[in-house]
Regions:
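ABC transporter nucleotide-binding domains
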Residues: 1-168
């Protein structure tokens, strides 16, 4: 079974997400001479259609702040986010439209899975939101489970609490 979304970039690859000089500083203390934490300082990168971005770094280096900025859970001090050629938050690309296309996978597997949904339901949820039929979404969920080494017949109907940390 093939993934539902096949990206044919044909020709030169165009960035799907372009981050230009993203800045977020936190000001600690209200008095003159207060400390400034430069959590994200002029970060720039591009993600080409079909690519997956993973961010790795030392504790406190700005990974989570960068992710929050990309999701617009925090506002940047400076810089721009361009998604599919449109500036995020502009009149041409609403936050709702942007957030339907971009997602963040949290590093805490216990908090990122809905405890009231089976693995199959959790995996199929994103497909269903985008109009994929229940049958196709279920088949894709089974494909993905098998792809990561979890036998669908054994794991599709389990709830997150019934899986080990590594399986989550």
């Amino acid at each position: 079974m093939q993934p539902f979304i096949n990206v044919d970039i044909g020709g030169p690859a165009q960035p799907l997400l372009k981050v230009n000089n993203l800045v977020r500083h936190f000001h600690l203390g209200a008095r003159k001479g207060h400390e400034v934490v430069r959590a994200v300082d002029n970060v720039s990168f591009e993600v080409i259609k079909g690519e997956t971005l993973g961010v790795v770094g030392e504790s406190g280096c700005g990974k989570s702040t960068t992710a929050r900025l990309l999701m617009q859970l925090l506002n940047q001090d400076r810089g721009e986010l361009i998604f599919d050629g449109l500036e995020v938050g502009s009149s041409r690309l609403s936050m709702k439209a942007y957030r339907r296309q971009v997602q963040m996978v949290f590093q805490d597997s216990y908090a990122s899975l809905n405890p009231r949904m089976t693995m199959e339901e959790s995996i199929a949820f994103g497909q269903r939101v985008h109009g994929v039929s229940q049958k196709e979404a279920k088949a894709y969920a089974h494909y993905l489970l098998a792809h990561v080494g979890l036998e669908p017949g054994r794991f599709a109907h389990r709830y997150p609490h019934a899986l080990s940390g590594g399986q989550r």
